Amino acid sequence: MLVYSHRPEVREAVVTAVGRRPAPDLGRIRYVEASGVAEVLAACDAGEVDLAILDGEAQPTGGMGLARQLKDEITDCPPIVVSVRRADDRWLATWSRADAVLVHPLDPLTAAETVADVLRGLGSTAPATS
C-alpha cells in the first residue's frame, strides 16, 4: 500500500491509523511511503501498488489532483483513498474519482474499516499475508 504526502507526520498518521492488518480477514499490509509525485507515478506505472492513500493537502501537488491524473492515465489504476482535512472537502475527493475518503483527524476504527472495504473490493487481487 502506497501512502503519499510531502509531510512525514501525515504519512505516519495514516500508517498508524490503518495499522498493519485493518481487518482479521485480510493479510498484513506492507507500506511504501512516497513524499513526491515522481515516486507515486513510478510505483503505480510499475504495478507495485495495490491501494494508494493520497494526502489531499500535499504540496506542491495535492492528492486530489494526483488521484484524478492516475485514474485518467493508468489503465489498471489501483484503488485510491484520499485523505482530507475538512469533512466539507469530501465532494472534492469525489471529483478526483477517489474510491474512498478519510477525514483528519483520522479515527483508527474508521480508517481501518475504510481501507479494509476498499481492499475487499479488490477480490482475489487483495494483498497476500506476509
Where are these regions (language model features)?
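Conserved acidic segment of CheY-like receiver
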Residues: 1-19, 52
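C-terminal output helix
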Residues: 13, 106-115
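Short hydrophobic/Thr-rich beta-strand motif most characteristic of the beta2 strand and flanking loop
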Residues: 26-35
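Acidic, metal-coordinating helix/loop segments flanking the phosphotransfer/catalytic sites
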Residues: 34-51
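Conserved phosphotransfer microenvironments
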Residues: 50-71
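Two-component signal transduction core modules
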Residues: 52, 101-102
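His-Asp phosphorelay/catalytic-motif detector in bacterial-type signaling
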Residues: 74-79
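Alpha4 helix (beta4-alpha4-beta5 surface) of REC/receiver domains from two-component response regulators
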Residues: 85-101
